[in-house]
Amino acid sequence: MYYFHKFNSFDYHIYVMSISLAVLILILLNIYISFKGFKDIIFFEKFHFNINSIKNGEYYRFISSGFLHVDNQHLLFNMITFYFFGDFVLNALGIFWFYILYIFCLLSGNIFCYLINYSKNNYSAVGASGAVTGILFSAILFYPDLQLALLFFPIPMPGYFFAIIYLAYTFYGIKKQNDGIGHTAHLGGAVGGILLSLFYNPNIVVSSFKTIILMIIVIFIGIVYFKKK
């Protein structure tokens, strides 16, 4: 995923970022723990997200599972996305609240996943997607002029438009549950990112008013769609 900033009506510039130490530390931690999980199945089984294990009191899995990944592609996609948006949020929040946001979104994603899949004792998952999605949505709120583009669809789009498309697809994925993607964690992470960003700086209600209203509308429609038989 690339990010763009619009200079004028016709010109878009792709930034090449230098990475901050705070972002680099989390990326390296994800890489180290994920590769250990790739090589050590006992380690992976002990720390991945599993409904039955959490019911039995292994609550650490809410955090530990967020640093494991299924494979190199899964890890790479999450870390590339985090690389592109991490420094945006770090600059807006400062290092302390940046780390609070990361962990909060990781937790909110996994807790939401736990609640939605509570009856499925064998349900398992891994990945930093909840935290990364929260970082992404926080960046969209703090930088309302941010333009985004997907690697496979390299046409810039406004952040608010990307957000509503992402949320709509996430609800669709939760409803269908047929693609092996942790959409529930994505949604929980996104909501966590929105809420903590608003808590940290309520003024973004004004600067990103349109984005917030559209998000609320999509989430409301998504809840209705999800509950529909």
What are these regions (language model features)?
Residues 2-229:
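A detector for small-residue-rich transmembrane helices and their helix-helix packing motifs
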